[in-house]
Amino acid sequence: MKFKIKLVMSRITMTVLSVLILISACTSGSKTGTNRQLPVYLDESKTIDERVEDIIPRLTLEEKVALCHAQSKFSSPGVQRLGIPELWMNDGPFGVRSEVLYNSWTKAETTNDSCTAFPALTVLASSWNMELASQYGQALSEEANYREKDVQLAPGVNIARTPLNGRNFEYMGEDPFLVSKIAVPYIKAIQDNGIAVCVKHFALNNQE
């Protein structure tokens, strides 16, 4: 039971961290024209820990629960009264996928629905080139920004253990040392461009 509680609180904290990044982007450089003091969670001069500690008590239980799950295929709800915007995610590791409708996998066919089909991560890893991994992440995040995404559901770091796994192409091979080396510059490049990353998968997908 304690583990479940800790897991839920961890998910809430990570979600709040993500929305604070969005709030920072929305409030950066803005001027209110008043002398009212910003709440701590909106104050970019405060540490992330301080901002998280300030905003969590402001959230109702219902709002905390809502932040922990999706409202559509690739978005989570915000909290309008606190200025927390919606969180828009993209899947996956080697490109910005085509848009789908809100609650179905039907193609949305929007006008900005364009992207580059980057080489699979297995190909990237086979280069053993850390600089190339950084350039890969940089290019991917540029397209994610263009498509107004907040979180990249990537990279895939599961270790290839069986050739029957239908998702091996999302991963970086069977060598955990190589995976750890390639994933880091990939992640940093995406984050440096203002996009959060969601490293996956937590469990079981080695055999999927």
Feature-to-residue mapping (PLM):
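N-terminal secretory signal peptides that target proteins for export/translocation
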Residues: M1-M9
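Bacterial N-terminal signal peptides
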Residues: T13-S24
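Glycoside hydrolase catalytic-domain context in secreted enzymes
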Residues: A25-E208
